[in-house]
């Protein structure tokens, strides 16, 4: 099978969903901007050679409906002969886009793909028009439809204390802020948005980071999902944000022929299911499957990105994979979704992009990106620098 490499990976800044920088910018516009930027940044690539654009998005309605991948593409100069499709694996959608494109290249269905994802949670809320089948209560726990309650359950199962969660939440903001101050968010491409006064500007910094977050300030917040006995607060949950991310991937042979330098190759991929009531456990079996396919163990992973849906969830998975005592220098070195937010369709390729940048910055060879998925799934990708 063909070797698949990542040639480029970028993202927009993350905007707050409530009256944030992208309050007047549509999801298709954010997506089209990144599609165009990937072409602009890689002039050796003839856009006609792109086989497909695969875009992740969860709430496929309103401005995000009717195949947002194609709608966004039509806002660009990418030839109309290039195809585009939108995929949905809830939180793992854009990582699923990466997996689908990788499989396409490996099986000979084209050499060049553009993948990514978007979610404008300000314009299309996460729970907009959700209508669960009433009969699901017979086959799945009530908590299955409440992501916060699944985090509460998983945290209790794994002994993740309120103090551990508060420290992890503060860590996310502190590390993300340090990365911003030190200019380490080199994956961000300036994107048009509006400041607090409504002035249109090019925005090149995340709006969601709270630099003043501390373990002490986190400890003062009340539990939001289980007010009586709970430990999960707004501060230890992923922020609601708007954003997009994108990657250009191709076969190693095509990259060489075009004179493009690969940044990483895909070593292994996996998805897995778990009980929907502890949906946040999904990264554990997905990671185990991916590592087995790569012929590796967690000892081989030098850096990892765990999507921070909730501190209780991320810490539970880190513990189950044997890293709870050693994760500080390996996991989410620039913070994560607690600080940046979790725009659902965007996050899979966002954490993959962040991981690749961190692997380069820290001269590491093997990295893992993994995330939980609502209703009980997980997805994981193992990357190797080349």
Swiss-Prot record:
Gene Ontology cellular component list: cytoplasm
Organism listed in the record: Pseudoalteromonas atlantica (strain T6c / ATCC BAA-1087)
Keyword Secreted among record annotations: no
InterPro entries: FadA, Thiolase, Thiolase-like, Thiolase-like_sf_Thiolase, Thiolase_acyl_enz_int_AS, Thiolase_AS, Thiolase_C, Thiolase_CS
Name this polypeptide is given: 3-ketoacyl-CoA thiolase
Active site: 91, 342, 372
The protein's Enzyme Commission number: 2.3.1.16
The keyword Transferase belongs to this UniProt entry's keyword annotation: yes
Gene3D superfamilies in the cross-refs: 3.40.47.10
UniProt record, GO biological process: fatty acid beta-oxidation; phenylacetate catabolic process
Free-text function comment from the UniProt entry: Catalyzes the final step of fatty acid oxidation in which acetyl-CoA is released and the CoA ester of a fatty acid two carbons shorter is formed.
Family membership: Belongs to the thiolase-like superfamily. Thiolase family.
Single GO molecular function: acetyl-CoA C-acyltransferase activity
Location(s), subcellular: Cytoplasm
Subunit structure, as described in the record: Heterotetramer of two alpha chains (FadB) and two beta chains (FadA).
Catalytic activity: an acyl-CoA + acetyl-CoA = a 3-oxoacyl-CoA + CoA
Record's keyword terms, sorted: Acyltransferase, Cytoplasm, Fatty acid metabolism, Lipid degradation, Lipid metabolism, Transferase
Pathway: Lipid metabolism; fatty acid beta-oxidation
The encoding gene: fadA
Primary location group: cytoplasm
Pfam families recorded: Thiolase_C, Thiolase_N
């Amino acid at each position: 099978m063909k070797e698949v490499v990542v040639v480029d990976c970028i993202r927009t800044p993350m905007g707050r969903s409530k009256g944030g920088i992208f309050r007047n910018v549509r999801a298709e516009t954010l997506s089209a901007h990144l599609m165009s930027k990937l072409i602009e940044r890689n002039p050796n690539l003839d856009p006609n050679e792109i086989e497909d654009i695969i875009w992740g998005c969860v709430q496929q309605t309103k401005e995000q409906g009717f195949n947002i991948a194609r709608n966004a593409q039509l806002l660009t100069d990418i030839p109309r002969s290039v195809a585009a499709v939108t995929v949905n694996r809830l939180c793992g959608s854009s990582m699923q886009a990466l997996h689908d494109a990788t499989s396409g290249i490996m099986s000979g269905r084209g050499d060049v793909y553009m993948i990514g994802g978007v979610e404008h949670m300000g314009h299309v809320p996460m729970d907009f028009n959700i209508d669960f089948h009433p009969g699901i209560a017979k086959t799945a726990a009530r908590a299955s439809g409440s992501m916060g309650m699944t985090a509460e359950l998983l945290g209790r199962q794994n002994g993740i204390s309120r103090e551990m969660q508060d420290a992890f939440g503060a860590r996310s903001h502190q590390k993300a802020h340090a990365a911003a101050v030190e200019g380490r968010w080199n994956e961000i491409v300036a994107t048009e948005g509006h400041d607090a006064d409504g002035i249109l500007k090019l925005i090149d910094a995340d709006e969601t980071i709270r630099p003043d977050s501390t373990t002490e300030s986190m400890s003062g917040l009340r539990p939001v999902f289980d007010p009586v006995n709970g430990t999960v607060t707004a501060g230890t949950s992923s922020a609601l944000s708007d954003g997009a991310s994108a990657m250009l991937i191709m076969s190693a042979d095509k990259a060489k022929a075009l004179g493009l330098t690969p940044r990483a190759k895909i070593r292994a991929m996996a998805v897995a299911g778990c009980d929907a009531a502890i949906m946040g456990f999904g990264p554990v079996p997905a990671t185990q499957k991916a590592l087995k396919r790569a012929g590796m163990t967690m000892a081989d992973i030098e850096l990892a990105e765990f999507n921070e849906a909730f501190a209780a969830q991320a810490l539970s998975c880190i513990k189950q994979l044997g890293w709870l005592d050693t994760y500080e220098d390996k996991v989410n070195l620039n913070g994560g979704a607690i600080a940046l937010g979790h725009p659902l369709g965007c996050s899979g390729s966002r954490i993959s992009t962040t991981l690749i940048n961190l692997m380069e910055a820290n001269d590491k060879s093997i990295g893992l990106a993994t995330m939980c998925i609502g209703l009980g799934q997980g997805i994981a990708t193992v990357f190797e620098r080349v």
